[in-house]
């Protein structure tokens, strides 16, 4: 039996956070900025099957050119619970190791001041095709057969891309740094669509029986019902990490961190549960810097990345303030005030949740015995929240009360419909009105005149937000 989680109800919540980046004194060498794994050029260098130990050098280096070396230290509030990439759709840990057929085009973001700045990559769910480029696929097309009611997607698999070779990893030695093949892609896409624990299997029932075949030496073809074509293009290209079949065959899955194997810019070197995750540079990474003074350089620039697991908010802030952490997201407005006073060398960026989900609360709609199955309960929970009050008290009047599915950002400007928009449905506008009396009435009609008890699983950064909401619901 499949388990499905639905994002709803308290998904139109306003969120604003800060990205704080540590800035070292001028006399101190700084850690080079990493080049994210988002290539644009189709060039695929031929790489050996054993790691090259020397870092690539350019004959002439201008003062502005990026330098090789250094380790970027980050912090997050939760530990990793799922290492198998098929069970994930996104995430920092996976994106450093594994890759998909499409990913974001780095040159269309800021790119250190050399990109087109069509996006700032703030949207975790950024799914605009115009902002994508080929990673493990370097060619693609899709066609429509209305007579058969069928859509066809064809991917050309990029030549010259090899699996990272970490001599200290048994799983990596098993793959032996071989070239990625069309068979690898077919295996991975089928696994994502048919394995009961895979993310795509759980959320996209319509893909469980699609036809995925190798149709050429480096060609993969997918046939789907025509109604599902657009979603299939997005999900199969940019929501399934490609994995080596032999690792899954030998170990059953890849949920042991020691079996992590990918084509990304880094390799998983070490993991200490509840403490840290350590990544080492993949010396055979296939891609090049696409833009700026480092254009053409082999990526990545960093020697490694270290992620500290720091559940306690005060500990994370202290690590950032003292320079033990180079960058951190999810800083609250209240904490940002103190950081500005006590750590003035920090750089900051304020951003609003750009996919409109804010701080989402997941509820089970496939369980009829739970209150959330009734739409009146879900509407009551929304109407019992004073969104404007939270905006003013918790966020200092800054930020948006976002309306699902997208907030007002330039990437999704055409899709945004605000509360004051004449096209915004009145029934939806009512959800943001803060009407606790109407909420009580709806609960009574749904059979819960005295309310009901439930529990939520939260991260430490969400506690303040939902503590306010909990008090509102209690009334």
Where in this protein do the model-derived segments appear?
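C-terminal motif of bacterial Sec signal peptides marking the signal peptidase cleavage site
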Residues: 21-22
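Short, well-ordered beta-strand elements
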Residues: 69-78, 151-156, 185-188, 220-222, ...
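N-terminal lobe/hinge region of extracytoplasmic solute-binding protein
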Residues: 73-146, 190, 261
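Gly/Pro-rich hinge or "lid" segments in bacterial periplasmic/extracellular proteins
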Residues: 105-110, 114-127, 194-196, 233-306, ...
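Aromatic- and charge-enriched surface segment that lines or borders ligand/interaction sites
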Residues: 130-131, 138-197, 221, 307, ...
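Surface-exposed binding/hinge segments that line
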Residues: 154-156, 178-179, 183-186, 191-248, ...
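Extracellular/periplasmic solute-recognition and catalytic clefts
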Residues: 198-199, 213-214, 269-280, 306-369, ...
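Structural transition elements
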Residues: 266, 398-442, 462-465
């Amino acid at each position: 039996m499949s388990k499905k989680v639905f994002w709803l109800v308290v998904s139109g919540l306003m969120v604003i956070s800060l990205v704080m980046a540590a800035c070292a004194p001028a006399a101190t060498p700084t850690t080079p900025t990493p080049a994210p794994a988002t290539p644009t050029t189709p060039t695929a260098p031929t790489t050996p099957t054993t790691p090259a130990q020397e870092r690539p050098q350019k004959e002439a280096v201008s003062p502005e050119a990026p330098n090789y070396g250094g380790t970027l230290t980050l912090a997050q509030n939760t530990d990793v619970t799922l290492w198998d990439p098929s069970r994930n759709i996104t995430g920092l840990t996976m994106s450093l190791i594994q890759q998909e057929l499409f990913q974001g085009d780095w040159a269309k973001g800021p790119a250190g001041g050399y990109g087109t700045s069509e996006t700032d990559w703030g949207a975790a769910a950024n799914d605009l095709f115009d902002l994508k480029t080929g990673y493990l696929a370097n060619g693609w097309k899709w066609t429509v057969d209305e007579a058969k009611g069928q859509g066809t997607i064809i991917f050309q698999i990029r030549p010259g891309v090899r699996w990272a070779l970490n001599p200290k990893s048994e799983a990596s030695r098993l793959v032996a740094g071989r070239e990625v093949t069309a068979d690898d892609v077919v295996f991975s896409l089928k696994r994502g669509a048919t394995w009961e624990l895979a993310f795509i299997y759980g959320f996209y029932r319509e893909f469980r029986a699609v036809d995925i075949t190798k149709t050429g030496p480096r060609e993969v073809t997918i046939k789907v019902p025509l109604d599902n074509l657009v979603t299939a293009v997005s999900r199969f290209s940019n929501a399934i990490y490609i994995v080596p079949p032999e690792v899954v065959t030998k170990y059953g899955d890849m949920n042991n961190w020691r079996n992590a194997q990918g084509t990304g810019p880094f390799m998983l070197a070490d993991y200490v549960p509840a403490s840290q995750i350590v990544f080492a540079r993949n010396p055979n990474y296939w891609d090049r810097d696409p833009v700026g003074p480092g254009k053409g350089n082999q990526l990545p620039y960093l020697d490694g990345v270290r992620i500290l697991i720091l559940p306690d908010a005060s500990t994370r802030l202290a690590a950032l303030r003292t320079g033990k952490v180079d960058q951190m997201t999810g800083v609250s407005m209240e904490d940002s005030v103190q950081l500005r006073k006590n750590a003035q060398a920090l750089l900051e960026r304020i951003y609003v949740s750009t996919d409109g989900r804010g701080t989402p609360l997941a509820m089970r709609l496939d369980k009829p015995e739970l209150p959330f199955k009734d739409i009146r309960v879900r509407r009551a929970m929304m109407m019992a929240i004073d969104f404007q009050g939270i905006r003013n008290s918790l966020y200092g009047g800054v930020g948006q009360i976002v309306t699902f599915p997208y907030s007002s950002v330039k990437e999704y400007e055409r899709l945004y419909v605000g509360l004051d928009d004449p096209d915004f449905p009145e029934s939806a506008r009512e959800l943001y009105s803060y009407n606790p009396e109407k909420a009580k009435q709806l609960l009574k009609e749904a059979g819960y005149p005295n309310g009901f008890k439930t529990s939520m699983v939260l991260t430490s950064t969400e506690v303040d937000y939902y503590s306010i909401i909990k008090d509102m619901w209690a009334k």
